[in-house]
Regions:
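Conserved donor NDP-sugar-binding/catalytic core segment of glycosyltransferases
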Residues: 127-155
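The conserved acidic donor/metal-binding loop of glycosyltransferases
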Residues: 117-121
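Short beta-strand/loop segment that forms part of the nucleotide-sugar
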Residues: 49-61, 89-91
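Cell-envelope/extracellular polymer assembly enzymes that use nucleotide-activated donors
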Residues: 19-22, 52
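Short, acidic, metal-binding catalytic loop of nucleotide-sugar glycosyltransferases
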Residues: 39-50
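A conserved acidic beta->alpha catalytic loop
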Residues: 55-74
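Glycine-rich, basic loop-to-helix element that forms the pyrophosphate-binding segment
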Residues: 91-108
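Short aromatic/hydrophobic "clamp" motif used to bind/position activated sugar donors
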Residues: 113
């Protein structure tokens, strides 16, 4: 008697349709861009429970300017982006952008990542579209050679 075939269809859940993503943001002295960074995180059209925002801040020279100088500031940002998880790290030495991106990618929590710069505006579908391209093309990395530059008069 032939064996019964198992149902090979996987159920679609947020976990497999929208995998967990670490949003990686390297920065130094970018405090004026915090409202823009928060707006990007809040308006991504992606399940917020699947996201972690991992910020790496560093020192440059004698200045010690931190994006998140204390627990009170961190809590305020966490409340603004909830339920996105916030992971903030400060390293008290000068680092190149390449060092920061490497550190972030080695220490991220989730299996996928998106590099999100502090002073850029992202369309709301940025994360969903990136995951869609990865799955559709069966590749491990996606990006775009095209950029749109705008110069807002607002001082974020």
């Amino acid at each position: 008697m032939p064996k019964k075939k198992k149902n090979s269809k996987k159920s679609i859940t947020a976990e497999n349709e929208f995998p967990k993503i670490s949003i990686l943001t390297p920065l130094y002295n970018r405090n004026k861009w915090l409202p823009l960074m928060i707006a990007n995180i809040k308006y991504f059209d992606y399940p917020k429970e699947q996201l972690e925002w991992y910020i790496l801040d560093s020192k440059d020279g004698e200045e010690d300017i931190r994006l998140i100088p204390n627990d009170f500031t961190k809590k305020n940002i966490e409340d603004m982006i909830y339920p996105v998880k916030l992971k903030y790290e400060y390293i008290p030495r000068k680092m190149t952008i390449a060092e920061k991106r490497t550190h972030l990618s080695k220490n991220m929590t989730h299996p996928y990542f998106a590099n999100v710069d502090s002073d850029d505006i992202y369309v709301d579908s940025y994360l969903k579209y990136g995951i869609h391209l990865l799955k559709k093309s069966k590749v491990g990395l996606c990006g775009s050679p095209q950029m749109i530059f705008i110069y807002p008069h607002l001082d974020y």
